[in-house]
């Protein structure tokens, strides 16, 4: 992806980036998170723990934390394995966060419903 495309997407509103995320992960069947040798990166405050996700490696790299690397998650594993664990642990998702903000915060069920709705268009 070229720098001008990255810049255009980064400059979208959080809601527009969320729509972009849903379309891309549904189409490419891949989600990106940040991981180190001890596990997934989490963010948030005392009130809510958030699991940050991006649609493409380039965007995860923009928000890369020390010692964390972008890590690809196949969409099936994301929906069938990771999301149920996050839901059980009361973790919500920060979709497409940037250095200037947390992105759109969604529950596991909201993410699943939006991805399923988008995937129906590809069938």
Give the location of each predicted region.
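Conserved NAD+-utilizing ADP-ribose enzyme module
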Residues: 1-123
């Amino acid at each position: 992806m070229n720098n001008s495309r990255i810049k255009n997407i980064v400059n979208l509103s959080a809601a527009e980036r969320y729509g972009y995320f849903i379309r891309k992960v549904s189409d490419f069947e891949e989600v990106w998170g940040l991981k180190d040798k001890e596990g997934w990166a989490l963010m948030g405050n005392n009130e809510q723990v958030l699991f940050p996700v991006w649609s493409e490696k380039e965007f995860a790299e923009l928000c890369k934390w020390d010692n964390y690397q972008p890590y690809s998650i196949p969409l099936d594993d994301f929906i069938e394995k990771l999301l149920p664990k996050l839901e059980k642990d009361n973790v919500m998702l920060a979709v497409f966060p940037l250095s200037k903000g947390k992105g759109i915060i969604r529950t596991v069920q909201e993410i699943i419903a939006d991805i399923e709705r988008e995937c129906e268009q590809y069938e």
